[in-house]
């Protein structure tokens, strides 16, 4: 029996500096990944952040939470990200890139531990 080839929707918390965190999708499914590649090819800003980011712990100058929800329109979420300072944007990008690389590495390791078959085709008897 092989591995499951379906992405189970999960959210993981990624720590940032100063006690902050972001919540991101553990992994993108094929449709989400294709959408990400498409918007990245269109050079739309914050494409990868929008694909992964689910929420965060950020507060504004008034110490109130900065709202961010997947239910908000994409343009509103893009504008919210665009209002952050450059250092926070860099930290978001680095954290999501690191998370994505770790997930890719975990998948490669999982694939490497699967039993090797001889490549023979199996057909169902009718």
Residue ranges, per PLM feature:
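Short acidic-hydrophobic surface loop/beta-edge motif
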Residues: 9-19
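Short, surface-exposed, charged amphipathic helix/loop patches that serve as local interaction elements
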Residues: 3, 20-126
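Extended acidic low-complexity intrinsically disordered regions
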Residues: 1-10
